[in-house]
């Protein structure tokens, strides 16, 4: 999937970050926030896998989870690049 389609797919997330999120006090238990994680996951992994990662993250963002630093995992493609460049 092209990067342009991924950017279009994250427009609702950007809308949420800009217009809806500021109306509420910060409550995300993770760094980066769930919305930032979702946007990065979709850009890095595509709409389907990134959306799945974002959904898993949002479901974990609750009082039963400690939270903390939880970055988006690197894609296999990025891992392969790193191995080949060594």
Curated annotation (Swiss-Prot):
Pfam families: YidD
HAMAP family associated with the record: UPF0161_YidD
Membrane topology term: Peripheral membrane protein
Localization (cell): Cell inner membrane
KW rRNA-binding (keyword) present: no
Protein's job: Could be involved in insertion of integral membrane proteins into the membrane.
Source organism per UniProt: Oleidesulfovibrio alaskensis (strain ATCC BAA-1058 / DSM 17464 / G20) (Desulfovibrio alaskensis)
PANTHER family for the chain: MEMBRANE PROTEIN INSERTION EFFICIENCY FACTOR-RELATED
Main location per the UniProt record: membrane
Disulfide bonds: none
Family: Belongs to the UPF0161 family.
Cellular-component GO terms for this entry: plasma membrane
SMART domains for the chain: Haemolytic (SM01234)
Name of the protein: Putative membrane protein insertion efficiency factor
Keywords: Cell inner membrane, Cell membrane, Membrane
InterPro entries with a match to the protein in the record: Membr_insert_effic_factor_YidD
